[in-house]
Amino acid sequence: MIYGVPKGVMEFAMRSSTNILATPDNLKRWKKVNNDNCKMCYKPNTHPHKATLFHILNHCESFLGENERMKWRHDSVLNFMTLTLKENKPSHIQVYADLEDHKSNNATIPHHIIVTSSRPDIVIVDSSSTPPTVYLFELTICFERVGNMEAANQKKYNRYSSLTQDIKENGYNCKNIPFEVGSRGHLTLENRSRLTIIHKLCSPNLNFTNFWKNICKTSLLCSYAIYLSRNDPWTGAPHLLPVKVKPVEQL
């Protein structure tokens, strides 16, 4: 359960969990409207998509662009994690992320480790081990339904498996750890365990429960914003933060 959110957000969370929000497919089922097609991604002479909650929060093509709302949600979660980790990390840990001001020469893996066009979302380098250990973390915001998170995890693991091997061949330890957060704020036990790895590396003195709950809260708040703007163009927005986090200057 996520606490400390406005009443409207909590109502959204509860109604979305039982699929009783006023989405077009539900409105048609309740005989309130005759058409349940998504008007945001409809194109003439194409098969229309039904505007379900899954479609609105995770699947609408018009919401998937570089400056669109789903990227904003993903990067808001990533931004909160990055700022929190950098603020609390020990000196032997370096944190890079696929965000402005948190890269190393426009890369998330420093070039002295490997030169690659791949940019995992979060890269943590632990220089306390011999050889140093490189952790590749890739975030996916998934709709919570059977099989979704498992499929996303396997897909991202496969994406970075060859890169992991290349880094090992360059003389480093390397771990490939994709993880998923639910678009409605849910976190599975498996993903909580994956976040434990990040937490122990960077912020062992930070309350872990608060850490993962604020990650989930960020996803939920962003999804509520996406739901509220489901019929409107997206004009962009700064990253959403669930709590005040001190900005960290990139060294």
Label each PLM-derived region with a short phrase:
Residues 1-50:
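Helix/loop segments that flank and initiate small ligand/metal-binding modules
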Residues 3-6, 26-31, 66-71, 146-152:
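Conserved, non-catalytic sequence blocks in retroelement Pol enzymes and Pol-derived host proteins
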Residues 11-14, 39, 122-125, 135-141, ...:
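Conserved, well-structured core segments
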Residues 28-37, 84-139:
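Active-site metal-binding core of divalent-cation-utilizing nuclease and nuclease-like domains
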Residues 31-84:
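Short Cys/His-based metal-binding microdomains
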Residues 85, 156-171:
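Metal-dependent nuclease catalytic cores in nucleic-acid-processing enzymes
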Residues 133, 138-155, 181-183:
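Short beta-strand-loop-alpha-helix junction that forms the active-site gateway
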Residues 174-251:
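Domain-level recognition of nuclease-like catalytic cores that cleave nucleotide substrates
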